Amino acid sequence: MALLQIAEPGLSPQPHQRRLAVGIDLGTTNSLVAAVRSGLSEPLADAEGQVILPSAVRYHADRVEVGQSAKIAASQDPFNTVLSVKRLMGRGLTDVKQLGEQLPYRFVGGESHMPFIDTVQGPKSPVEVSADILKVLRQRAEASLGGELVGAVITVPAYFDDAQRQATKDAARLAGLNVLRLLNEPTAAAVAYGLDQKAEGVVAIYDLGGGTFDISILRLTGGVFEVLATGGDTALGGDDFDHAIASWIVTDAGLSADIDPSAQRSLLQAACSAKEALTDAESVEVVYGEWRGTLTREALNALIEPMVARSLKACRRAVRDTGIELEEVEAVVMVGGSTRVPRVREAVAELFGRQPLTEIDPDQVVAIGAAIQADTLAGNKRDGGELLLLDVIPLSLGLETMGGLMEKVIPRNTTIPVARGQEFTTYKDGQTAMKIHVLQGERELISDCRSLARFELRGIPPMVAGAAKIRVTFQVDADGLLSVSAREMGSGIESSIQVKPSYGLTDDEVTRMLKDSFEYAGDDKVARVLREHQVDAERLLEAVQGALDADGERLLDEEERLVINLQMDELRELMQGTDGYAIEQQTKRLSQVTDAFAARRLDSTVKAALAGRNLNEIEE
């Protein structure tokens, strides 16, 4: 609930009377904090006048060093200096070991638990490292604004899953920050440009940072920012450009690819410096140790072209998700320091057929937008009216159904916050419990989706199969965090779970889930139809077998039992194969040959129920 602001008649509250809230861009390479002052959103500088804080943390035995000095010391003290910690947020040790070549740290911890980086100050989790960055930003903001913060809006990549978002909130709390909201980075950029340009129409947000790439397609109408679709690649960014240049240096200099962490840091610093110099120059001299070489912009373009092409492919996919054409995109906003690379801007302009917008510093635009939203959430009235943000979930959410199928409850690109419910039922007679398996992904089979959580609903009243009604409700809050509940409608029993996975998706998994959903759409549909026919067949076989065991000897002669058993054997054999149509047809044949048996059972049941009762009793 926003506090009511009171001022003398005819006077507006002064800036220091506003509730102090900030927007924070917690980036892979750099981080920033911004705030609204005198009606304008602007980044806040440190005592030296620097706005950008490198996301680097160096641990000493008795103190913590954050920022530029830590970044510079990384090559001399690689084991105690953590860079790009954002890549580790919400992930397990097994996942981060896959990035071992790029992360020169000593990890400790169980294989399925949060990774800890072994430092001279002891083990440090990614949450703790991020918290140390956030503490510096909080202290900077409070010093600049002259008071204690009521909260912060912190931005995250659109592709961050539940575990990564929760880890970000945990880091903020550890840093002494009240999280007003987590905001997708592309949406924050849209807020910044929407405020300055009052634009309406369809806009693309191309966000290429140090470690992640996000593309979002938004519709801006009358102050409402609606995210139509999102996409991207969590394993693509300026860091990857640096690694490509570093590989070129190693090859051109004839060096061994097996180098120690300290040398690797120096190599990457040389690569990054060359990349930045080529933003304005056509060629640059690269110096690494005793080796000197020349890298041209043309050569750089060739090195990074595969990565640029990957980003454009994600752009096309996101536009296709919206159902619009590329020509309908009226503006393209560039976000992230890596969009300064000339080839990136050229490629984006070629794809969308228009020059991208770069009026706001691409390193600052996300923090500026987050600050605008933080100011609004803190209860400070904005000139020009209110602002409504409609984020979306990046991947579909659903449940496992019989046959190992994924039943989507909330499709991807659904606006959040959202709550959706769907009714399910029991599979077997007398079933008193149901296992709820929550999944995330775009494929039809659960083996191709990501498992988020499992829980059970117990105490379901015994009924015949299909009679119970269990309503499962998915709720995603404004931060993208998911809770799931299941309720048996007759008895009212309920069970629920808040989905907090111990670690998040790997980079490869995030990319694969969307890519494969398109690439294997046809195969998935065939596989789903096959499994549905197999489930129907299995259900019928169980029902027929149960009927035979109960009444077969009494109601069928030997020849009738033989015919039914032959049809059942035929169906069981077909179920081992992959011909869904054949299974469907044989299921129908078995159903037909058992129709007479079912009718006799019904007749027998009715007669048994009426035995010994007269007409008057029946009518009553």
Swiss-Prot record:
Keyword Ubl conjugation: no
Record flagged with keyword Ion transport: no
Keywords assigned: ATP-binding, Chaperone, Nucleotide-binding
PROSITE patterns (alphabetical): HSP70_1, HSP70_2, HSP70_3
Coiled coil: none
Superkingdom classification of source: Bacteria
Pfam families documented for this protein: HSP70
Entry's Gene Ontology BP terms: iron-sulfur cluster assembly
GO MF entries: ATP binding; ATP hydrolysis activity; ATP-dependent protein folding chaperone; unfolded protein binding
Function: Chaperone involved in the maturation of iron-sulfur cluster-containing proteins. Has a low intrinsic ATPase activity which is markedly stimulated by HscB.
Similarity section: Belongs to the heat shock protein 70 family.
Entries under PANTHER family matching the protein: HEAT SHOCK PROTEIN 70KDA
Protein name in the entry: Chaperone protein HscA homolog
Organism listed in the record: Pseudomonas syringae pv. syringae (strain B728a)
